[in-house]
Swiss-Prot record:
Keywords: Amino-acid biosynthesis, Metal-binding, Methionine biosynthesis, Methyltransferase, Repeat, Transferase, Zinc. The active site is at residue 703. It holds the Pfam family Meth_synt_1. L-homocysteine binds at residues 440-442, 493, 608. It catalyses: 5-methyltetrahydropteroyltri-L-glutamate + L-homocysteine = tetrahydropteroyltri-L-glutamate + L-methionine. This is 5-methyltetrahydropteroyltriglutamate--homocysteine methyltransferase. SUPFAM superfamilies: UROD/MetE-like.
Amino acid sequence: MALAHTLGFPRIGRDRELKKAQEAFWKGELDEAGLRAVGRQLRAAHWQVQKDAGIQLLPVGDFAWYDQVLTHSLTFGVIPERFRAHGEAGPTLHTLFGMARGVSDDSCCGGAHAQEMTKWFDTNYHYLVPEFSADQQFQLSWEQLFEEVDEARALGHQVKPVLIGPLTYLWLGKGKGAEFDRLDLLDRLLPLYGQILRRLAGQGVEWVQIDEPILVLDLPQAWKNAFERAYNLLQSEPLKKLVATYFGGLEDNLGLAANLPVDGLHIDLVRAPEQYPSILDRLPAYKVVSLGLVNGRNVWRCDLEKALEVVRHARERLGERLWVAPSCSLLHSPVDLEREDGLDAELKSWLAFAVQKCREVAVLARAATEPEAAEVLAALEESRAVQASRASSPRIHKPAVQARLAAIKASDAQRRSPFAERIARQRAGLDLPAFPTTTIGSFPQTSSIRLARQSFKQGKLSEAEYIEAMHSEIRHAVQIQEQLGLDVLVHGEAERNDMVEYFAEQLDGYVFTRFGWVQSYGSRCVKPAVIYGDLSRPRAMTVEWIRYAQSLTDKVMKGMLTGPVTMLMWSFPREDVSREVQARQLALAIRDEVVDLEAAGIRIVQIDEAAFREGLPLRRNAWPHYLEWATEAFRLCASGVRDETQIHTHMCYSEFNDVIESIAAMDADVITIETSRSDMELLEAFEQFDYPNEIGPGVYDIHSPRVPSREEIVALLRKAARRIPAERLWVNPDCGLKTRAWPETEAALVNMVAAARELRGDLARG
């Protein structure tokens, strides 16, 4: 049979045991021995569950105390000086967690800010960015991989250690201090890979998996050349090497990847099925080919019959050189569907989490040589039934939604008048001062708010009691905003647990799991909603809350919604229709809410698109299509209102230059953005492009409890006014205030309002 393996398995545990142990350790409630014991138990359980599912070659090194890239940084001794404790022989778990979370001023190292965290390719997982210096030295400093190999082998498992490849590791990092080329570090780093491979060989390992996902990116020629050089140098080291690529197709890097002097290549045939024939044609006859046929980053069952066609063909071509795997590490999948005892039976039958995906991989591998095995035939029959159910289910396919999609006209995604005409009407109707002040939407989520929501869900509060509790919070938020002198108010979002989940719970076509947790970073786990069918809004979602808030004040109240692209990006999407179609369905549902808010007397509606840039494909040549449908989806949800109704959007990225034209194409009347940490430098993109609409650059960082002074905010606003005409500037924080406490929130907003008034004085004096 073909060999069944996985590239990695979720590390958090079926019941998020790792999260609970991490947080107990950080609070001092669990000692290091206790934390390490939890890690051992989880690793043993995860290896065994994969083995029981039919996986023959088990990954080791996919477990991490916080993040796999951070683990590699410790392994290679890439530890910034601020985290080095004087007198310690080497890094400890305290070092690791300090790099991830920062170190307080009273620790042994003194205060040290955490390393930067960013998205792992185009997933919703985040990694800790390695910090390199021009004189960076590498040395083996962390024994975790070798200890875990011994651990797994002692349990009788056949193992495949997992390493992030040298080129990908350098690509993921950033240079600190004097400018230098990270590739200059390669010759210093490669000897460590040699040491690691030799030590693993000494432990009895036969195969090692070397992850090089940057091979699916647009690589500069220097990096392509470096691949050949690096793997030529590693060729002489012991062990068979499987280079793993995922999250996309190799495209122009296909020849490079196929000809690397290694023993096998893993390719993602979920994201890029079209690369399969070319790989088989280009790969040397001695190499193993690992086919990623089961989606490692979604929750749907594999169409086994369709996948088996590829397996049969590959078996004929490759014989014993065929391996079968998920498309990528199962880190991005929830752990075990069996925990979901509350899910509707039909819906549950369509799903597969990590454990179930392992079984699918094993069935496909066995089917390569034993197509008539009872287990294979039963699995194929079950898969056919699932695919037939999904193809015909009226729960998925809704004629009314499809008819509405088909009826969309180009004019539906355009405001009635150009911005210049709209803004004149809006200014006349809203009658706001120069430098109008507002917030991004949410106010502090106190323990009393969370308790009220929890009690309502558990049936301990009646609906009337819950509504009154939320009304009380809204009254409090409105009263404080009026006292502070803000110009455009918000209701505070007390009723919302999450900016996606709140809306998804009220839309047809979404379902929620109880245990579908995936790791976002460290101990933070998220439970994305699942889009299973055509999406529609059965009733208004926010109107009553906003209408109540508006009834409390004569000032302008802003409605708050989450945009279609963000809803899509932070959910598990369908696989049977495109992301573009799902975004349009969401846009129509949100459009109805925007229109209803306008009818309720709400004159400003904010539609947040926090994930707009996150949706960009990994390859630049795919950007135009994505940006076209993503901007159209925003305009579709925002364009059903009169010119007098002002549409805001909020984005929180650190880079706008390469998408500024698309942001302008969204045609929001006002965009609020995160700029305080860049000292307003991000506004350069809007200045150079001559962005035509109004802008609210964030004037203070909400991620810090620190209260900015009036003088600081004034300085930032004056800097902004040198780039953007004063009449087009709004004044607001960087982001929502959900995670802050009320005292610091009020203190910061007092200074923000005072700063805006000072700028108005400047303007009046000319």
